[in-house]
Amino acid sequence: MKSLTLLTICAVLSVSLSMNDLALDVVLDPDPAAEPAPAADSSASSSASSSSSSASDSSASASDSSDSDSSSSSSSSSSSESASAEAMAEDPAAATEPEVIMKRDLASVLLRRKRAAGPAAAAFTLTQVESLSEVCELNLACEHMAETAGIVAAYTAYYGPPPF
C-alpha cells in the first residue's frame, strides 16, 4: 500500500513537472477533528508496543498505512481538482467545442447525403434510370458501384453527367 502511495505521488509530480507547473498546490484540510484522531491512534499503538511487541508491530503498521492512505487520497484528489479547475479557468469554452463540432459534422454529412440522394433520384423517370443502369451493366466496376452507391452516382463517376 505504501508503494502504491509513493507511485501515485511520483506520477502526480512527474505530470505536473512535465506540464511545467512547478508551483504545486497543496491543500490541507482545516478540519480540527481529523487531526487529533491520528495522534490518538499513534499513542495507542505506542502503548500497545510496551505491552506486546508483536501487537505493536501490527498496530503501528496499520496506523502508518491508514495515515499514508488518507494523506495520499487527499493530495491526489486536490491535485486532480486543481488540474480540472486550471483547465476550466484557461478556456471554459474548450470543454463544449468538441460536442458542437461533432454535431456540425454529423449535420453536414446528413445534409450532403440528403442532397446527393434526394433531387438526383427524383429528377429522373423510371425509364431514364433503367437506361442508365443498362449502360452501367457493360462496365463491371460501374455495376458494382451502382449496387453500393446508386445508379446515378455510378453513371456520373464513370461516364459523366447523365445526358437528360
Swiss-Prot record:
**Record note on modification:** Gamma-carboxyglutamate residues are formed by vitamin K dependent carboxylation. These residues are essential for the binding of calcium.
* PTM sites of type 4-carboxyglutamate: 130, 134, 137
Could you tell me the Gene Ontology terms of the biological process aspect for this record? biomineral tissue development; bone development; osteoblast differentiation; regulation of cellular response to insulin stimulus; response to vitamin K
Biased amino acid composition, Low complexity: 30-95
Residue ranges, annotated region (Disordered):
30-99
| Positions with a binding annotation for Ca(2+) 2 | 134, 137
Q: Which UniProt keywords apply?
A: Biomineralization, Calcium, Disulfide bond, Gamma-carboxyglutamic acid, Metal-binding, Secreted, Signal
**InterPro entries named among the record's database cross-references:** GLA-like_dom_SF (IPR035972), GLA_domain (IPR000294), Osteocalcin (IPR039176)
Enumerate the GO terms in the molecular function aspect.
calcium ion binding; hydroxyapatite binding; structural constituent of bone
By sequence similarity, the record places it as follows:
Belongs to the osteocalcin/matrix Gla protein family.
Q: Spell out the protein name for this chain.
A: Osteocalcin 2b
Annotated source species: Oncorhynchus mykiss
